[in-house]
Every structure is written in C-alpha cells, then in structure tokens.
Amino acid sequence: MIRETFHTDSKIKQVLFNKKSEMKLNYRLLEARFIDRPNRFLTRAELNGKIVESHLPDPGRLKELLKPGVQILLKQENGENRRTKYSTQAVYDGSTLISLNTLLPNKFTAHLLTEGKINFLKGWDIYKKEATYGKHRFDFHLQKEDEFMFLEV
C-alpha cells in the first residue's frame, strides 16, 4: 500500500512500507493555488501571482479535492493548438499528493514493478501493458515463471 506521496521539483516520490522509490519526470511541476473550475476540463489557479487556466485531464467531479485555496501542481505545456498553457497534474489533500493525471499512476506502478519495490509483487515481470482479456482491458499483464496475472491500477 502507498502510505505517502510527495513531490520535489520534477520528482514524484512514494513511500511503500518504509521503502522509498522515486521516478524522475521529464518535466517540472509548478506549484499553484486552485481558484475554481469553470467546467469539467478546465481549472483556474494562481501561479506566481497571476491567474492562469489549466487543462484538467480528469473530468471526474473531484469536489472533495478541488477546493479554493488548495495547492495543485501544474505542468507547462507547449503547442500552438492548445487552449491552455498548463495542465493540472496533481492536488494536495493535506500532506497527501493525489495524481489528477490518469497516465502517471500507471507509469509509476510500472517503475515500481521493474524496481521490485512492491513487496507482494516481487518476482513478477511486466509481460504486457494495456493487455486485453475478452472484452476487458487491464493495465498490466504480469508473468512470474509459468504463471500469469492481470493487474489493474
């Protein structure tokens, strides 16, 4: 189980059963204060004294998390066709950092699996990502010698 998550600059760290693991991101996370959410895919935040709009990749309600004044993490985006210059990556709930980027938890889980940092999954290798079984899709298809298992993050 993940006990604590926190960030420093471009690193996301998680503590699992007192074992630290970190995954370096190829982008910087910018600290901002959440103001409001005009629609499902847009947030407004205060970043370095300026109000900016940011794309929110998670269209869920998130009312328990996105409250005025909470700290959020933004990623600066490049692209001429983008409506916003930022995307909202995570939000703090107290001292716990919660990912709002639906791709990041799978990347981090793959990293932890590869590093052998998840105790109950030691020895299991990633056989395939985004594996299908019948009409279902799973985040990971794992293999340990002649055994196989599906894992959903």
Give the positions of each predicted feature:
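Beta-strand/loop nucleic-acid-binding surfaces
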Residues: I51-E64
